[in-house]
């Protein structure tokens, strides 16, 4: 790609869908290393961003993963979820396409609108998470309950992965809200770890070893 772009004058820019550039990842994911540890990567990310840091030292602990595993109380009422309104411009076209081209497939088309389809609805979804689910996100980060689809989970991954929200935007909103509302540190650190830690770490692995991963059954 780089050699071709130099011939036809294409400017190659970094994707805003990730916090790290490909160049940022080169040093950590050096081929000379035998193993890569997410914890080491995450600590580097915290130092680089300054999130939950005082100088080179973390505020509290590096990770509150051991405080992200509470069982959801039996009689606890889950937070209110505000689902996005249907965007008829996109939805009707999508329904028509699926019914036309996949009408003989198994199952049926679910027309419920569960995910945002534009920036405004994605932003509203993020705001609803901040206001309703963020405060106890850390306690119930790993919780599941039969019959409940969301609980305190953010469901921000599809919005970031599809480009409706950038990780930089989400992290800035998280930082601002957590500071204003005194969000518990296990909730704050828990979701920051997912975005600047795990997501960027897996991308770095794929960036450097995609061919090996695709051609093997390592995972």
Regions found by a protein language model. Give the residues of each.
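Beta-rich, aromatic/charged-enriched effector core domains that present basic-aromatic interfaces
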Residues: 1-118
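Gly/Thr-rich phosphate-binding loop signature of adenosyl cofactor/nucleotide-binding cores
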Residues: 124-127, 131-219
């Amino acid at each position: 790609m780089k050699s071709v772009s130099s011939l036809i004058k294409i400017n190659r820019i970094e994707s805003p869908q990730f916090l790290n550039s490909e160049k940022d990842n080169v040093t950590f994911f050096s081929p000379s290393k035998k193993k890569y540890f997410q914890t080491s990567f995450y600590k580097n990310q915290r130092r680089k961003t300054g999130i939950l840091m005082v100088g080179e030292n973390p505020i509290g602990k590096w990770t509150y993963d051991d405080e992200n595993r509470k069982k959801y109380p039996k009689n606890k009422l889950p937070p209110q979820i505000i689902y996005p309104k249907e965007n008829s411009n996109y939805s009707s076209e999508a329904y028509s396409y699926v019914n036309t081209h996949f009408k003989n497939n198994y199952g049926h088309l679910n027309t419920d609108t569960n995910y945002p389809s534009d920036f405004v609805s994605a932003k509203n979804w993020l705001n609803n998470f901040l206001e309703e689910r963020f405060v106890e996100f850390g306690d119930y980060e790993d919780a599941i309950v039969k019959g409940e689809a969301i609980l305190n989970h953010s469901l921000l991954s599809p919005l970031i992965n599809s480009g409706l929200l950038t990780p930089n935007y989400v992290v800035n909103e998280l930082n601002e809200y957590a500071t204003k509302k005194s969000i518990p540190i296990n909730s704050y650190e828990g979701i920051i770890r997912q975005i600047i830690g795990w997501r960027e770490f897996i991308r770095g692995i794929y960036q450097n070893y995609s061919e090996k991963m695709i051609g093997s059954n390592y995972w």
